[in-house]
Amino acid sequence: SLQAQYGVTSKVISEMISPTLHPESMEKVYMPMTNTLLDTGDITMASIVRVKVADDVSNSDVEEAMESIATAEGIRSVGMLPLSEMVELQTGEKQRFLKIYQYCAPRTAMTMVDHSDAFSAYLPCRIALIEDKTGQRWLYTLDMNAMIYGGAPLPDYLLEKALRVQEVITAIQMGGAEGDF
């Protein structure tokens, strides 16, 4: 890890870089992201959370579980993008499975955008169900810690809403991976 290699702590780095960042920014965002980036060389891996789908859970079970949890948690399913199916139809060639599920809590989304227009790039929340090149299935989503802790502290009202969305998306992702609802 970067901390072990260079003998630095996240507190020292945080104070050197910017005292205006969230006090947990180094611990929750920048050190884990940097370590993953250095380990993999892949910035996209450093910015996501992935969960392995249980082998005994079908794709339709994943989808049903995620939809059920989203409904129970009061977040809207706002679309699905069956990418692998679309490419198969266009090319006639079999593709490994990739489908993107989109979720949104509209009032929370507008509150976030009212704080910063840049939050719109995070909308809607997405979870991708993908079969990797070895046949293993995963659920991927953006790591919301960057949005929550990566800059200056969010106002309390917004932090509460952002943490709730993170909690719900995590529940959807974990429940989908296990086929639980």
Task: Please identify what each model-predicted range represents.
Residues 12-24:
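Short extracytoplasmic/periplasmic juxtamembrane "stem" segments immediately C-terminal to an N-terminal membrane anchor
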Residues 2, 145-181:
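C-terminal partner/receptor-binding element of secreted or periplasmic proteins
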Residues 21-73:
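Terminal, regulation- and interaction-focused segments at domain boundaries
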Residues 126-155:
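Beta-strand/loop substructures that line and gate deep hydrophobic ligand-binding cavities in soluble
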Residues 61-79, 163-178:
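N-terminal hydrophobic signal/anchor transmembrane helix of membrane proteins
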Residues 2, 14-16, 36, 64-116, ...:
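Ser/Thr-rich, low-complexity intrinsically disordered terminal regions
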